[in-house]
Amino acid sequence: MENTTTNPDVLERFLRYVQINTQSEDANCDQVPSSTVQFDLANVLAEELRELGAEDAHVTEHAYVCAHIPASAGAEDKPALGLIAHLDTTEVAPGAGVKPHIVHYEGGDLVCGTVDGKPVAMSTAKLPALNDLAGEDLVCSDGTTLLGADDKAGVAEIMSLVARIAQDPSLPHPALGICFCPDEEIGHGAELLDIDTFGCKYAYTVDGGPIGELEWECFNAAEATVCFEGQSIHPGDAKGRMVNAGNLFCDFNALLPYVQRPEYTEGYEGFYHLEGVSATVDHATARYIVRDHDAAKFQQKLDLIDAAASMLNQRLGEERVTVEIKQQYRNMAEIVRDYPELIDVAKEAYLACGVEPQVLPIRDGTDGAQLSFRGLPCPNLSTGGYCYHGVNEFVPVSSLVKMTDVLQELVARFA
C-alpha cells in the first residue's frame, strides 16, 4: 500500500499532542484519572473526533475518550472493531514542557539535544536498530524530557485514520469504536471502560514499539510489598537486642535470585524488580514487581517471596517480616490464543504495507491484557517508537505514516 499522505496529518497531530502534558501519578493511583492534566488532551481529542463526524464523542468523568464511527457501505453487518491507545505518559522521566523537533539522522550517534552543554545522545552500540534508520527523519524531544510517543504516537495514528475515513467514507471499514484511556502507565488504563457501551467484538491497542511489532502475549504481573519491623537500641548496648530492619531487608533481598533481575533477563525470562525501598533501624519497606509469562513460574516466584519471609521469621523466632501481594494483570495469551484470526489479519495488514511483522512477547502489560480477560480480545500493535520512558525516546516520521496505513489496511480486512 502506498503512502497516501503527502503532508502527514499524523505528524501534525503527533507534534501537537506531545506538547500537552498528560503524566499519570502513581501516588494518586486510588483515583482515575490519577492526574487532572489528562483531561487536557482528552478534551482536545473529543472535540477533534466530533469535528471528524463522530457525533457521540465524549469524555467520561474518569477521562476516557469514547467515540464510534459508522461502518462503510456494505459493512454494516460486520462486527464492530475497537482501536485503543492511552492518554498518559510515564512519570519516571520529565514529561512536562515537551519540545519536539525533527532530526534528519545520517548515522552515528543520534543527538536529540544538549543539556548543560553536553549532548543527549544514543549510540548505535546501545541501540543497534539505529543502523537501519540512517536517512530517516526522526521526531525527538530536546533532551530535557521524554517525547511521549508512548502512547501519543498511537493516539495520533488512530486519529489520522479517523481523519482519512472522514475525508473518504468509502474506505472499507466496519463500525469502529475509538477509545483513549487514562492511567495505562500505572496499570489502570482499561479498568473503567464500559465494554458493553463500547460495543466491539474485537479490539487492538496501538501501544507497541518499532513498526511491525505484533504482540499477544504479556507478563503475568504482581506487586509485592514487604515490611520489616526492627528494634532500635543504642548501638553501644545493642548486642543481642537490636534488630536492624534495614539489615533484614538486605538479608531478604539476597534470598531472591540475583540472575532474575530485569537487567539480566530477556524474551520469556521473568524477573523480580526492586522498585523502591525505605529503611531505618525500626522499620523498612520494600516494593517489588514480579513478572513472568509462564503462569507456573510466576507462582513459583511469588511462593519464593513468601518462603524468604518465612525463613527470616524462623531465624528470628518471631514475625518481623510480612508480605502483601497484589495481583496486577495476567498473560492475555490465555484468551487471545483462541482468536488466531486477530493475529493473522494483523500480519496481513503489515505485509500489505511492506512491513515485516515481528511477533514478540510483551515484556510488560497493556490495556489489552485487562480487556481480554473482561471479554474483549485485544492484541497489541506497534506505534513505531523507540526508547520509551526516557529522554532519548524518538519515532521515525515514516513509521507514523506507515502505521496509519497499516491501520487502514487492518480495518478494511474486517469490513
Locations of the language-model features?
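Short glycine/serine- and small hydrophobic-enriched flexible loop segments
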Residues: 159-166, 251-258, 409-412
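Active-site-adjacent substrate-binding region
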Residues: 247-264, 271-273, 320, 330-378
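Flexible, glycine/charged-enriched surface loops at secondary-structure junctions
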Residues: 26-28, 56, 170-175, 258-273, ...
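N-terminal capping segment at the start of a domain
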Residues: 7-35, 140, 329, 389-390
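Midchain, well-structured core segments that form catalytic/ion-binding scaffolds
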Residues: 127-130, 136-149, 183-306, 310, ...
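Active-site metal-coordination/substrate-binding segment of hydrolases
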Residues: 75-175, 180, 200
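A non-catalytic alpha/beta surface segment that caps or lines the substrate-entry region
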Residues: 29-78, 82-84, 88, 99
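Zn-dependent metallopeptidase/amidohydrolase metal-coordination segment
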Residues: 280-282, 356-409, 414
